Amino acid sequence: MYGHTEIQKKIQDKYDEIAALRKEQVAIAKSEGLSEVENYSFKDKNGNVVTLLDMFQSHDELIVVHNMGKSCPYCTLWADGLSSSTPHIQNRCGFALVSPNDYQTMSDFAANRDWKFPYYSGVETSFISDMGFSHQTEDGKVRYTPGFTTFLKKEDKIYRVACDLFGPGDLFSPIWPMMDMLHHSDKEWHPKFGY
């Protein structure tokens, strides 16, 4: 590729190992099998009620991103990146983002970021905690975790398929692997809302 064929072969071998490990990871994530979930209700950007079934649109599969809300620059980084991929994702399955912010806060923030995907407020539902993306701390505060859940629709029933977390260095934001290849890859960096 760039004149170091032995190095490139070693890199390709590692990619092959990573691909095999990723297959194992996906199999583990799906190993619980399908579990039926209720048809939760959310609010869209105008305050209208939208159900989980509605989010599938014309598809039988759905990806829901669990976003921690407008206060998290990391969640914003992932959402900004996913926004440009929305047409590709929606060609394959339903796609939406759910936030713990109220619908007006979420709507204002998403408009400011120019997000292209549908986004909903989950503030009046137990969906986020039921999916495992929030928990109560010892001091009584609610702590949110970012990630996504996949769903399958069979007739009018909804089944949870799998989930995964977002975090620095994950596979879901391409900037982390690219930054790893910088000379000073260990240099601490944090996303911001603006630069």
Give residue ranges: language-model regions.
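Thiol-based oxidoreductase modules, predominantly thioredoxin-like and allied folds used
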Residues: 89-105, 116-127
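N-terminal "domain-start" segment that seeds a small globular fold
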Residues: 19-55
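Short, charged, low-complexity amphipathic alpha-helix
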Residues: 1-13
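Thiol/selenol-based redox catalytic cores and closely related redox-interacting motifs
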Residues: 121-195
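Short active-site neighborhood of thiol/selenol oxidoreductases, capturing the structured segment around
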Residues: 52-73
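Conserved helix-turn-beta segment immediately C-terminal to the redox Cys motif
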Residues: 70, 76-97
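A short acidic (Asp/Glu
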Residues: 107-110, 130-131
